[in-house]
Amino acid sequence: DEFNSTDLGLQWQWHANYNELWGMPTCNGCLRLYTADLEHPATATTDAVAYRSLWEAGNLLLQKLPARDFTATAKMRFASKEDNQYGGIIMMGMNYQALVVRRVGEKFLLQQLHCKDADQGGAETQKTLATFKPTAKDTIPYSPAVYLDIYMQMKVKDGYCRFAYSLDGKRYKDAGDVFALRQGKWIGAKMGFVSERSNTKGNRGWIDADWFRVSH
């Protein structure tokens, strides 16, 4: 998907009923996905919700796998307004694994997120793989964003997935552990984008995905 239309392609499916605050394709030729809250404080009518995994994250934008063996590559710019906002790509199912960049201070951490038995309340683990300096920074005084341009890739073969990344779109480096795909509930495994924040204060960040391409 080149995201050159303001209509989202029919191959894409949200992980829950759509909320317009999650994002949409833009007239600038990219898909914008805003970071969504992973934790929710208690209110007068609801209890606090603590984070365990992305199983309950409704704003995952996913599509079904196109073949047994394939490579999917995304070109994106991640913009962060606050610490602990992150975005990237994910292979989603009852077990899942994601490759994301997370803002910490004035740098970005490349991280592997992994969860086993997410549907049963399994807790997510995080592994830091690399550290990057921002590609660009806002100069505005109010709530400036820092940006990272990155290419992310997943290679699937015989039921296993290997993630990789590149900063120039030419030289890719393997990232994290090989992951065995597992189906979702009532559906097969799905792949796509993740954009979240664990700090619910301050302004949201976002992913601008230029394209998501699949090759066989």
Model-derived regions: residue spans:
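Extracellular glycan-recognition regions
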Residues: 1-216
